């Protein structure tokens, strides 16, 4: 019997990746900025961070501020967002020492969320996303061949390795966590939320 077979992937979940060219030219300034915030607010806030330091939220709206200016430039180059769409961005800085991690969470009351890695050494803790398909069973996923799973990104979880100067933007409803920092250095990142609105 001849069969014509095809797979149609519906309801994809886009993860947008930006790599900043020449990031090393501004990296030290951003690192100093992060530690400066921690010095001003040593206690930080506790949300999903286990052992790590997290700053209070702040809006990205000050062109004269080094981090704000950098983030505005990055997000203004978002190639798939319509020009007529306004983005309101709030952010916070994370400093995870060796042994620190972030538990599973999502970001409510916004449209997109993201992370920018400022300092990320080897084994500093991958970001892990969980499949949003709530009723997907382990048996179903593990019954498929490796080629099928790889070509369709069909997994329960998906990892990204932190890379300095890389930004990921993802749907805010997507559950995710940050694995333990197993390096000997601090892992520094900026997390942010984006609220979208149409001018027209």
Predicted regions located by residue number:
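Catalytic core of non-heme Fe(II) oxygenases with the double-stranded beta-helix
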Residues: 94-169, 186, 196, 200
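Karyopherin-beta/Importin-beta family HEAT-repeat alpha-solenoid scaffold
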Residues: 3-8, 166, 177-178
């Amino acid at each position: 019997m001849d069969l014509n077979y095809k797979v149609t992937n519906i309801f994809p979940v886009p993860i947008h990746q930006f790599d900043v060219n020449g990031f090393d030219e501004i990296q030290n300034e951003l690192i100093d900025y992060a530690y400066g915030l921690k010095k001003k607010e040593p206690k930080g806030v506790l949300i999903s961070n286990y052992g790590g330091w997290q700053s209070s939220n702040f809006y990205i709206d000050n062109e004269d501020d080094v981090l704000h200016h950098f983030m505005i430039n990055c997000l203004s180059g978002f190639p798939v967002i319509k020009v007529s769409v306004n983005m309101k961005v709030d952010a916070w800085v994370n400093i995870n020492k060796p042994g620190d991690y972030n538990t599973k969470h999502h970001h409510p009351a916004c449209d997109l969320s993201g992370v920018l890695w400022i300092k990320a050494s080897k084994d500093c803790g991958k970001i892990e996303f969980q499949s949003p398909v709530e009723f997907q069973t382990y048996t179903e996923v593990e019954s498929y061949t490796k080629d099928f799973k790889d070509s369709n990104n069909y997994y329960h979880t998906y990892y990204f390795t932190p890379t300095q100067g890389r930004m990921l933007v993802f749907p805010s409803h997507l559950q995710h966590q940050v694995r333990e920092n197993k390096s000997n250095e601090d892992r520094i990142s900026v997390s942010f939320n984006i609220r979208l609105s149409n001018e027209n």
